Amino acid sequence: MRLPDSCVRGTAVPAFAAWCGLFVVVALGPCRAHGEPPQPNGTIAGHPALAGSPRHTTTAQGRQGDAVNVALIGSEEELHQALAVAGWYAADPITLETSLRIAADCVLHKPYAHAPVSDLYVWGRKQDAAFEQPVGDSPKQRHHVRFWRSRELDRSGRPLWLGAATFDERVEISRTTGGITHRISPTIDSERNKLLGDAINARALDGYYWVEQFHRQRDGRNGGGDPYFTDRRLAVGVIDLRR
């Protein structure tokens, strides 16, 4: 279920404060029919890995890639469980077999819920995990997100999973590399909100908050030359599967 943008609010905190204080966390529960936001019910400490965290991914060639727009706090097992109950599929690794399959399934209009995603880089390494939700009858269109695990842990010993969520609109020839690639939708905030909304409705989060002005600019282009625009915020969710 896609959560209305008006329902994904949480508590806003300045970027400089996101790693050094205590903030009100939004209590979680299914979004009401008219988009009423949930009410705050507690506090959490900002994660130390947010201090100086990258704002964008990079490509293997060093170009600026997709914008970072979401983060989750929890163990690797919790991350996979939370995304699974929220209806997202783990992406297969890139191999010759999976590369041939995604190409064939795009042409033949066959579903591939675990289709691989291309590598992007944060903290000098490719994504540690990637998830997707297919749309239609082939991998041409899909919601997807990549995550990178922080080396720093919070006071509870949990890493931050920094993520970039986008929607693949179609397959095309890249304007920058000349290779076959997906073109992303420019409305990256909607993908961030969808991911957060899916996790909320699956009762996989304990709370979330916004880091305001995480990005300096409201628009940009990714490594494939695709334009995007954003409200400049980062959504940070705290995983709790005991709810």
Feature annotation, model-predicted:
Residues 1-13:
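N-terminal secretory signal peptides that target proteins for export/translocation
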Residues 14-29:
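Bacterial N-terminal signal peptides
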Residues 31-34:
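Sec/Tat signal peptide C-region and signal peptidase I cleavage site
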Residues 36-61:
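Compositionally biased P/S/T/G-rich terminal and signal peptide-adjacent segments
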Residues 53-81:
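Terminal, regulation- and interaction-focused segments at domain boundaries
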Residues 66-68, 86, 143:
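Envelope-exposed proteins and targeting segments
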Residues 75-93, 97:
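Primarily extracytoplasmic ectodomains and periplasmic/lumenal surface modules that are beta-strand-rich
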Residues 94-243:
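A cross-kingdom signal targeting lumenal/periplasmic-facing segments of multi-pass membrane
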